[in-house]
Amino acid sequence: LKKIIMIEAYICDAVRTPFGKYDGSLSQVRADDLAALTIQGLLTRHPQLESIYINDVILGCANQSGEDNRNVARMALLLAGLSEQVPGTTINRLCGSGLDAVAMAARTIKSGEADLIIAGGVESMTRAPYVMGKAHKSFARNMEIEDTTMGWRFINPRMKAIYGVHTMPETAENLAERYSISRQEQDKFALQSQLRTSLAQENGFFKDEIIPVILPGKASDTMIFSKDEHPRQTSLEALTTLRPIVKKEGTITAGNSSGINDGASALLIASKIACDKYQLKPLAKILVTATAGVHPEIMGIGPVPAVKKALAMSKAKIEDMDIIEINEAFAAQALAVMKEFNIRWDAPHVNCNGGAISLGHPLGASGGRILANAVYQLHRQQGKLALCTMCIGVGQGIAMIIERV
């Protein structure tokens, strides 16, 4: 019998574009070009790597109905100048796609099928198209036109009958009611996200992960876009004036929800063999990843069973985590997850540099962002373990635990 050797998967680098606001600085950049920029950014930072050394490129993308169609990972790697011999695949676990792409890369490396993979995700929500279904018969006039920016489209009547069809804000409102999370609690959490991001920007905490984007300007002028543009100056007083978006007496507002954004992320995942062979410095080891399902009407609680599975797999406790990144789809959603684990709303180790409420949530790219932040924050604090978790539309959760190297 062959001796079984445990292969580890390491994060050796993590980059992303700045996140653009809806119809903002990245509105003129296609999703495949955005993803290509992060792939190029990784290789630029590691000039010893020839593109042919990359065994695969795995990207997450939630839309895939516009310019990000037909396997955006393959398109992006070719646009980035990688060898045509490098394969690429695109996966879709909606909001968790980017984190799942990294998990898929780690599993592939741990299985011994690859040594070096680029993984991450991309989303251009600004450029998400309207789509129209085909007529089911000649001269039919009942074709639906759907906005693909976010949420449901072409809903299966059976799905609607069995589970109902709740918008993302409605699912957050459901959690706010179920967990008795007040509007004030949500607004305070949202303000905290903005303030923490502002402080992180002032301290230059994002400079290690951001790849500047050169934007075309008038004539020969160009502009360098190098700072997230979704964060905003606000106050608790200003947040309290915003109207609820689900129902008149509701608590979910634009101010305590994540943004609609554009961006891309990419991480360099390697085996120990690849690290030694290509002189790559491991930053963190990917320990475990877990996914779980919940009822679609409370999709935001998905991280809870996913985190519990990940903790059981790693034989760790939530108290062992030095850094926790909970993707802030909504303040109510993040607070519900924190309540389940008895974590204070203002815990300093949770979303310590802000989250999706302040930075934005370009769906496929967000997993790479929270993972990059966790990696660099672990090193800044000299911590050991970090947990990254996200809720996922239609009722899922994903969680990953990493260890600083």
What is each stretch, according to the model?
Residues 5-29, 150, 235-301, 305, ...:
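Condensing-enzyme catalytic core mediating Claisen C-C bond formation in acyl metabolism
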Residues 16, 28, 32-37, 48, ...:
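N-terminal extracellular/periplasmic Venus flytrap/periplasmic-binding protein-like
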Residues 28-96, 100-117, 121-140, 210-225, ...:
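Conserved beta-ketoacyl condensing-enzyme motif
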Residues 31-46, 72-76, 101-104, 168-175, ...:
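Short, well-ordered amphipathic alpha-helical segments that serve as non-catalytic structural scaffolds
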Residues 61-116, 146-151, 162-167, 233-259, ...:
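Conserved catalytic cysteine-centered active-site region
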Residues 91-123, 176-205, 266-273, 338-339, ...:
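Active-site-proximal alpha-helical scaffold in enzymes
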Residues 116-174:
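Flexible glycine-/small-residue-enriched beta->alpha junction loops
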Residues 170-173, 206-209, 217, 287-358:
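Active-site pocket-lining segment
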